[in-house]
Amino acid sequence: MRITYISKSIIPSRTANSIHVMKMCQAFADNGHEVVLLAPDSKNEYEKDINDIYDNYGVRKNFKIKKLYHPDIKGGVIIYTLAIFFYLLINKKFDLVYGRFLHGIYVATLLNNKVVYETHAPLLDRKSHRQIIFKRLVKSKYFKKMVVISQALKNIYLDRGYLQDSKIQVAHDGADTVENFNHKIDLLGSKDNLKVGYTGHLYKGKGMEVIASMADKLDEDVEIHIIGGLEKDIKFWKNKI
């Protein structure tokens, strides 16, 4: 099957959603599908000094990446959506459009393309334009399925009467299979100390406040190793701890 994956993730970047998108495209390709990933051409937001996008994300180069125009201005998302529309209009050699970008998935149905929409969160604002687009999307005969990452999220959409049960597929987030459990990474600090790891973003609400508050209460033979975060957040916590 030929799949066009529509994303609004900045690639390359440090965001979790960009990692998810790249891993999903690799997984589709690993299962024998021909995949093209559409992503915004937002050079001002790219992670700097990345020579190879695929290598940066630790994925195989078994799918293509196509960057589409997305100006860094108010309303840029509308222009990006139009860029997706015209790309799909010109490039018709695919069987399915899949993605997490609601606007892009919706315009794909306007061109009579079969679509699968993936979402990781409920639609909270019932009066927003996203709500209108979503309702139009799910009424389209070209809408085939919505993928959610938990049964709880599926229940929210069912309770609100958006879709029938058969139209929502639960597919929990996964991870690559670990091939070598004995592989060790050399970390800073003493080899004899207990090493506690944290991976993820460092902005408020992700857990760094808890780590910072308990750091000076731990025994000296306990080390905390933090991996992740944007440069501004790394700088903030380095100055604070």
Indicate where each model-derived feature is located.
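An amphipathic, basic-hydrophobic alpha-helix
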Residues: 51-97, 106-110, 130-137
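Nucleotide-sugar donor phosphate/pyrophosphate-binding loop at the beta->alpha transition
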Residues: 75-83, 111-114, 119-142, 155, ...
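A short, active-site helix/loop in glycosyltransferases that binds the activated sugar's phosphate group
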Residues: 107, 140-168, 172-180
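Conserved donor-binding/catalytic core segment of Leloir-type glycosyltransferases
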Residues: 4, 147, 188-215, 219, ...
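N-terminal strand-loop element at the rim of the active site
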Residues: 5-15, 27-79, 229-233
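Acidic anion/phosphate-binding donor-loop and adjacent secondary structure
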Residues: 125-129, 158-159, 167-193, 204-207
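Glycosyltransferase donor-sugar binding loop
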Residues: 41, 199, 223-237
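Short His-centered aromatic/hydrophobic patch
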Residues: 98-104, 119
